[in-house]
UniProtKB/Swiss-Prot annotation:
Name assigned to this protein: Putative (5-formylfuran-3-yl)methyl phosphate synthase
InterPro entries reported in the protein's UniProt record: 4HFCP_synth
Organism: Methylorubrum extorquens (Methylobacterium dichloromethanicum)
Source taxon at top rank: Bacteria
EC number: 4.2.3.153
Keywords: Lyase, Schiff base
Pfam entry (one): 4HFCP_synth
GO MF: lyase activity
Known catalytic reactions: 2 D-glyceraldehyde 3-phosphate = 4-(hydroxymethyl)-2-furancarboxaldehyde phosphate + phosphate + 2 H2O
Function: Catalyzes the formation of 4-(hydroxymethyl)-2-furancarboxaldehyde phosphate (4-HFC-P) from two molecules of glyceraldehyde-3-P (GA-3-P).
Group of enzyme by EC: lyase
Protein family (similarity comment): Belongs to the MfnB family.
Length: 236
């Protein structure tokens, strides 16, 4: 695991989803803050094989924070998947939480204490008490993402006040927060104003803006530059 894990930052940090060690190095060299392992061919929360996650973590070598998708199953299935991915040495493990009850959430978080992040989908009705429930269950963070990956963006599904309330709820309950969902470089100024811990990208930083194609190091570098510049005063 990385020695530089942090759940807070002066401004949003850049999460880049990668599908293998080569892309992880591309993202790392371009300045990404968090390297997120997932399979873009399998939707929003497609899990990679544990050996691939392990290779990504080894390649990053503690130079950035790492996360990996465990999947979007439920019950014993997801509990076992969390334990398996946790054993790779990745810093954080992401799972879909959907309509899971409090007992199921607590069971999931207990598989890797202090390392599980719950993912909520923008297409669903994201409950206001989501951050509070995840914190009570033992999760370390919460993210909003889009389930569909056909180009519909987070900002077209949820208004800025809704996203701001989610980020504020995470902060109130001590959770790391993240926003993702078919984001492009143009979304950074607006979403950065909401001050989440992370903004997550995949397709917008790939060749031809196609999440199934290879990660483009130049685009990652542009995203890093935009993140470091901070939100524009006119980006309301």
């Amino acid at each position: 695991m990385s020695d530089i894990v942090s759940i807070s930052s002066a401004r949003p940090r850049l999460l880049v989803s990668v599908r293998g060690p080569d892309e992880a190095l591309t993202a790392l060299r371009a300045g990404a803050d968090l390297i997120d392992a997932k399979d873009p061919e399998r939707g929003a929360l497609g899990a990679l094989p544990p050996e691939t996650v392990r290779a990504i973590v080894a390649g990053v070598g503690g130079r950035a924070v790492t996360s990996a998708v465990a999947g979007d199953g439920t019950g014993r299935e997801i509990a076992a998947a969390i334990a398996t991915i946790a054993a790779t040495g990745v810093d954080f493990i992401k799972i879909a939480v959907g309509g899971a009850d409090d007992a199921a959430l607590a069971e999931a978080a207990a598989q890797a204490p202090g390392r599980v992040i719950g993912v909520l989908f923008a297409e669903d009705d994201v409950a206001e008490d989501g951050p509070a429930r995840l914190a009570a269950a033992g999760f370390v963070g919460a993210m909003i993402d889009t389930r569909g990956k056909s180009g519909t963006t987070l900002t077209s599904l949820m208004a800025a006040p809704q996203l701001a309330a989610f980020v504020a709820g995470c902060r109130t309950h001590g959770l790391m927060s993240g926003l993702a969902g078919s984001l492009g470089l143009g979304d950074i100024p607006v979403l950065a104003r909401l001050d989440p811990d992370y903004l997550g990208f995949r397709g917008g930083l790939c060749r031809a803006s196609d999440r199934r194609q290879a990660l483009d190091g130049a685009r990652v570098a542009q995203a890093v530059e935009a993140m470091r510049a901070g939100p524009r005063a006119d980006a309301a």
